[in-house]
Structures are given as C-alpha cells and as structure tokens.
A protein has these predicted regions:
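Short alpha-helix capping/helix-loop boundary micro-motifs
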Residues: 76-81
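Long, compositionally biased stretches
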Residues: 3-70, 87-99
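Beta-strand/loop nucleic-acid-binding surfaces
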Residues: 73
Length: 99
C-alpha cells in the first residue's frame, strides 16, 4: 500500500496595511496598486488569494505579477466609484490571505 504525504499549506494570518497611489493600466480603464513588500517572502508563493479593503470597501482578489516589477492588486471600477478615487489618488489598503 502506498502512503501519500500530504503537504500542509502555509497560511499567513497577518493583516498588511499601507497607503498606495492608484496606478492606471495602459490602454484600458483599469487600475491597480503596487504591493510594497516581498510577496514571495511573506506568503511563500507567487500568486496569493487575499481579502483586501480599499478605503474600507471590501474586495476578494489576488496578488499577482502582471509584467510589473512587483506584485499588484487590481481595483475594480465599481470600487473606484464607491471610494471616489481614480489613478493618481492615494488609497488606504489592507490585505489578508484567504483560503
């Protein structure tokens, strides 16, 4: 009988909090913020599912690299409308890993 070892996935419980400038995605009506820390070091993986807030508005998304020098998280148009902010504005962000 073969016994498989199940890897225990690491889950980071820390809440990260920072202020960031909203950046514009070139050629489309998209926006994102850059993550100001080393995501691979903090979460032990490259793409991370997170629960985030932008000025207190909830969002579930992922920290990703999209041909950018660092990880980013997108800010949907409806969230930008809800917080009345656009590219160039500063936003308060919280990020916590989710399962």
């Amino acid at each position: 009988m073969k016994v498989r070892k199940k890897e225990v996935e690491y889950m980071n419980e820390k809440i990260y909090e920072f202020d960031a400038e909203i950046k514009k995605v070139p050629d489309i009506d998209g926006a994102y913020v850059e993550i100001p820390f080393d995501v691979k070091e903090e979460f032990r993986k490259g793409r991370v599912k997170v629960h985030a807030t932008f000025d207190g508005v909830d969002y579930d998304g992922s920290l990703v690299r999209m041909k950018t020098p660092c990880h980013i998280i997108g800010i949907r148009k409806d969230i930008r409308a809800a917080i009345s902010k656009q590219p160039g504005d500063m936003v308060h962000v919280t990020v916590k890993e989710r399962a």
